[in-house]
Amino acid sequence: MAQQQSEIRYLTPPSVDVKKKKYCRFKKSGIKYIDYKDPEFLKKFLNEQGKILPRRITGTSLKFQRRIAQAVKRARHLALLPFVTDMMK
């Protein structure tokens, strides 16, 4: 049997996006401690439902993502941040 090599043809050529490299804002600005008593700062790392945004979206390093998660959990426990909400921002 003859093998046919299938060729994929696109209507528009696939484009390769040059994405800007994400950086950890904590390392860049030299922040060592994430304060759990500052809910306005922590809201930058939460979505509208109050869930913690993942690293792939925020660009933070693993070390600081863990610290953010711990600070958010502490703030929730002290009722500085809600556990769940419909529209937070």
Swiss-Prot record:
Function: Binds as a heterodimer with protein bS6 to the central domain of the 16S rRNA, where it helps stabilize the platform of the 30S subunit.
GO (cellular component) term, any one: cytosolic small ribosomal subunit
Pfam family of the protein (one): Ribosomal_S18
Organism: Phocaeicola vulgatus (strain ATCC 8482 / DSM 1447 / JCM 5826 / CCUG 4940 / NBRC 14291 / NCTC 11154) (Bacteroides vulgatus)
Subunit details: Part of the 30S ribosomal subunit. Forms a tight heterodimer with protein bS6.
PROSITE patterns: RIBOSOMAL_S18
NCBIfam families recorded: S18
Molecular function (Gene Ontology), one example: small ribosomal subunit rRNA binding
Ribosomal protein in keyword set: yes
Signal sequence residues: none
Family per record: Belongs to the bacterial ribosomal protein bS18 family.
Protein name: Small ribosomal subunit protein bS18
